[in-house]
Amino acid sequence: EPSARPTSYIIYKAEGQGGFDNGTIVNTTRCQMQLEPGKLYHFKVAAVNAGGESFTTETLSVLYNPAASKSVLIVNNFHRLASPQVVDDEEKQGFDLNQDPGVSYGLTAGWSGKQQVFDRSRMGNETSFGLGFSGNEMIGKFVAGNDFNYVQAHATSIAASGKYNISSCSSEVIASGRVQMKNYQAVDLINGLERHDGYTHAFFKSFTPALQNSIRQYASQGGRILISGSYTGSDMQTEEEQAFLSDILKLSYEPTGSTAITRDINPEDSTVTERDSIVCTSPNVKGLGLQFSYYNELNAQHYAATHPEILKPVGNYAFTAMQYDTGTSAAVAYKSTTYRSFVMGFPLECIIDERTRTSVLLGILKFLTD
């Protein structure tokens, strides 16, 4: 609420895998504290006034490693909170959980089931054929949403290598220029489920124009960047946005369900037969010498990447670095003499197995920085 001005702040701190402390009260927006070298710290902040305490901010992490020669900046760009996909036209109305289940603040048990009837003409019909009728498959089930702690998950994996210093920030300070990516040997951008859905009151976007400009500038300065998230391609549909994807990230977006031509070769006479096939993704991925799965269906443990994307390499020096089980491209890597990038079609933090997630992240950083 804009008129709710804070009079003080509470800084909560956690060390390593430990829980957060009871907080330290500060009266200004600046604070200095002594941190031990070699120890990973996590912070979140709440605002306070006579009316009480706010929700806390996203969790940010920091590590000073005296033996490290390289520094990684983790940038959180996953701030979205949203209802399921709104359907509202002359013929249909409702919430389509299959199209987009939305993003709750943390856990929610708010759904009885997926809406099955969207026909406006059935409004007022209180039977299973009436507008808004839903299933009951989700009764009593919790669904994980945005916990705002994914910087912590990435930082924990990076710290396991013992090779890097770690800093972190919100994407807003990157877009505003307050934090310069050029000061870091690699940037890890967390996009999560960030996208402009067209119906949420707040504006969310995978790459705002300001963030695009910051990434362009970082690339021109020889930057090394990892980007992971669910809507890298589908949220960038204007001519200028698609130029950013192809010119800077060296990729193009292929919609799931589109038709591609598959060429079958007869091993006996080498004749080629062409046929149409439907391109699709899978919750199983192979890449970097590993095979793994990510959260693809709604569950109580972690938010799900229900709409991963197919990202195809564009131009010289770009190549497919991960594949879904269906054979389609799950990630695009680019390595030239000027800059490097690695873009995934699903959120890295959604990889289910923690050890595998750490191996994937460290493998990508090795590609970017070695």
Regions found by a protein language model. Name each.
Residues 260-353:
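Catalytic beta-strand/loop cores that center a nucleophilic Ser/Cys/Thr
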Residues 41-45:
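Hydrophobic/tyrosine-rich beta-strand signature of extracellular beta-sandwich/beta-rich modules
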Residues 67-148, 219, 236-237, 243-258, ...:
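Extracellular ligand-binding/catalytic regions of CAZymes and related secreted enzymes
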Residues 193-300, 360:
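A glycine-rich, often tryptophan-bearing local segment used as a flexible ligand/cofactor-contacting loop or short
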Residues 75-79, 169-172, 189-194, 221, ...:
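Active-site-proximal beta-strand/loop segments in catalytic clefts of secreted hydrolases
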Residues 113-244:
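Helical hinge/lid and interdomain linker segments adjacent to catalytic or ligand-binding clefts
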